[in-house]
Design a protein with these regions (language model features):
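Phosphate/pyrophosphate-binding catalytic cores of soluble transferases and nucleic-acid-acting enzymes
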Residues: 1-274
């Protein structure tokens, strides 16, 4: 018999946190975050991380579990989420996966296998060199030439995933997007319900703009400055997240604060559109 799991997803600022708490309290659920940023310690404001008082006693997993210099990718998410699910089932409760990153959710839901090929260290080093010499956008364009679908799904700043997709294509001759589609076609090992929250676009945009303004008021600049002082740098996966890379540009003197805030609002709206 398949074990139950609930997925609750939707765009930024749509109200997933509040809905997930209400749902968990009604059905006896525990929450697993599928957010690629909230897993990191010290990154509270920019990730819109749930506060302990907001949890209302509902257990949460994959929140504040990694240091910002640690890598967090889909395979690690699968491993950590499965461990959390074991605990939740042992407690007699239902896992509620909230987020977040759709790719991560699909990987968990359909138990997608990402271990088909081994790493090619020589080719990987060559791609890393190209990224440093010619920039992330150049490497992203190389991916677009061989796997346009993956290029649409992977942000140019996520150099590690771009390299992995290029590496997979070189080793197998297959697009990693096609491989993942094949894996997704498998039957899920879980009895799942999948909910997508949505709202009027204008209302959503207004909430996003207000949220960004509130983040700045709450100390986003100070949070990013503190991360810098701890030695965390822009080339780390954690520091490439929305809210962090824009403020880093400001703190590094590459743009004015008004421009950084404008870009953050704009990119967050675009990000929300992709999840709607």
């Amino acid at each position: 018999m398949k074990k139950p799991i609930i997925i609750l997803t939707g765009p930024t600022a749509v109200g997933k946190t509040k809905a997930s708490i209400e749902l968990a309290k009604k059905i006896g659920g525990e929450i697993i975050s599928a957010d690629s940023m909230q897993v990191y310690k010290y990154m509270d404001i920019g990730s819109a991380k749930i506060r302990s008082e907001e949890m209302q006693g509902v257990p949460h997993y994959l929140i504040d579990e990694l240091e910002p210099d640690e890598e967090f990718h889909v395979v690690r998410f699968q491993e950590m989420a499965k461990q959390a699910m074991k605990k939740i089932y042992a407690n007699g409760h239902i896992p509620i996966v909230v987020g977040g990153t759709g790719f991560y959710i699909q990987a968990l839901l359909y138990d997608i296998d990402f271990t088909e090929s081994n790493e090619d260290s020589f080719y990987r080093e060559e791609l890393e060199r190209l990224a440093k010499e010619k920039g992330a956008e150049y490497l992203h364009e190389e991916l677009r030439k061989v796997d346009e679908k993956s290029a649409e799904m992977i942000h140019a700043n996520n150099v590690k995933r771009v390299i992995r997709a290029l590496e997979f294509f070189k080793q197998t001759g297959q697009k990693i997007s096609e491989h993942n589609e094949t894996e997704r076609a498998k039957e899920s090992p879980y009895d799942f319900c999948y909910f997508v929250l949505t709202d009027d676009r204008k209302l959503l945009y207004d909430r996003i703009n207000l949220r960004v303004d509130q983040m700045v008021q709450d100390g986003l600049l100070e949070e990013v400055q503190s991360l810098k002082e701890r030695g965390y740098t822009k080339d780390m996966v954690s520091m490439q997240g929305l809210g962090y890379k824009e403020v880093l540009d400001y703190l590094d003197g590459n743009c004015a604060l008004e421009e950084a805030v404008y870009i953050l609002k704009r990119d967050t709206r675009h990000f929300a559109d992709r999840k709607s």
